[in-house]
């Protein structure tokens, strides 16, 4: 899709109005917010929830007529945004409809493979482990998120008292959970428990947080393995201390199912161990690339010491934001195939 709005070259992107279009999955909004935060834009979040056959057959169908797309008073109505960013298959019918209604007025961006072709948006981002490529496709090694260098630096300026009281080294354990492509067999849980117990034997403290996808059996494994050591284990009440855990951990352990959490861990510049069960081909390519880059290492069944290594922190959001800004100001310009 070629954009030809002549007004953009003279308009600051900082004055652009943005829409974020996602379903109700937190991980989708995390990626969109990371990019729009890097652009320093105000935005309106448009959460979509197609029903029935439209949910089943997304991303290929149009929004339902009952949603009155484009009509005054509906959730999707003029004035159209300058920039729209969509993530997830349920959002694709809406970004495609927006392109038809707004035309060159709106610069459209899709994060992740839309499955509906390169013409879906003006710009498409996919992680390197996705094989989609094209003139309007850019890639980065990790996924975008909101933990920028500035945000992490700000978090590190003031350490919460309960974290400061923990002896170092502080090991963060970031728990994901099963997905359609990723399952935890009992043997995997047992192996994870042994690995964490070997870490506990090295006398660190722990910062443990599950996610919304984390099943009780996975949380229990981390609970049992770390309870002999000083720790903070977030049980779901109140605000998740995850941002402070990221900022103040000396070493991080993350389950391989979560590309978002692994990407966030690799923004810290701290050693990241990844616990892997059976991986899909995409996940395997992602984690292999991170190991080759030097950000992560596989969590072994047993550790005799906590290894230390360094790498340049990975931040995808500002790279994607820079490409959006360049493309938005220079309609029709070519895009590099990679921002890594």
Where are these regions (language model features)?
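Short, charged/polar "capping" segments at the starts of alpha-helices
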Residues: 26-29, 53-55, 117-118, 181-182, ...
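Leloir-type glycosyltransferase catalytic cores
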Residues: 288, 292-340
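Catalytic donor nucleotide-activated moiety binding site of glycosyltransferases and closely related
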Residues: 203-238
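A donor-sugar binding/catalytic signature common to diverse glycosyltransferases
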Residues: 24-25, 242-283
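Short internal beta-strands
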Residues: 45-47, 126, 206-212, 276
């Amino acid at each position: 899709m070629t954009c030809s709005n002549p007004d953009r070259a003279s308009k600051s992107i900082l004055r652009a109005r943005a829409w974020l279009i996602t379903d109700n999955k937190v991980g989708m909004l995390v990626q969109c917010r990371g990019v729009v935060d890097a652009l320093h834009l105000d935005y309106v979040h448009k959460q979509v929830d197609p029903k029935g056959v439209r949910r089943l057959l997304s991303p290929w169908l149009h929004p339902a007529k009952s949603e009155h797309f484009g009509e005054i008073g509906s959730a999707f109505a003029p004035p159209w945004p300058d920039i729209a960013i969509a993530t997830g298959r349920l959002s694709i019918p809406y970004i495609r409809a927006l392109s038809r209604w707004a035309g060159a007025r709106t610069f459209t961006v899709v994060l992740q493979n839309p499955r509906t072709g390169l013409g879906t948006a003006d710009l498409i981002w996919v992680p390197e482990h996705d094989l989609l490529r094209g003139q309007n496709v850019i890639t980065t090694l990790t996924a975008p998120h909101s933990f920028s260098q500035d945000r992490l630096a700000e978090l590190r300026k003031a350490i919460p008292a309960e974290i400061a009281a923990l002896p170092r080294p502080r090991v963060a354990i970031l728990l994901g959970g099963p997905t359609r492509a990723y399952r935890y067999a009992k043997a995997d849980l047992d192996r994870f428990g042994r690995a964490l117990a070997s870490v506990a034997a090295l006398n660190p403290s722990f910062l443990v947080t599950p996610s919304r996808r984390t099943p009780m059996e996975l949380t229990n494994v981390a609970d049992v393995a770390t309870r002999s050591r000083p720790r903070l284990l977030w049980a779901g009440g109140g605000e998740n201390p995850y941002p402070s855990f990221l900022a103040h951990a000396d070493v991080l352990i993350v389950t391989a199912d979560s590309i978002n959490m692994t990407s966030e861990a690799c923004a810290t510049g701290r050693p990241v161990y990844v616990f892997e069960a059976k991986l899909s081909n995409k996940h395997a390519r992602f984690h292999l690339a991170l190991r080759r880059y030097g950000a992560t290492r596989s969590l072994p069944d047993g550790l005799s010491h906590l290894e230390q290594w360094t790498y340049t922190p990975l931040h995808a959001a500002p790279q994607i934001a820079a490409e959006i800004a360049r493309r938005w100001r220079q309609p029709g310009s070519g895009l590099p195939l990679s921002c890594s």
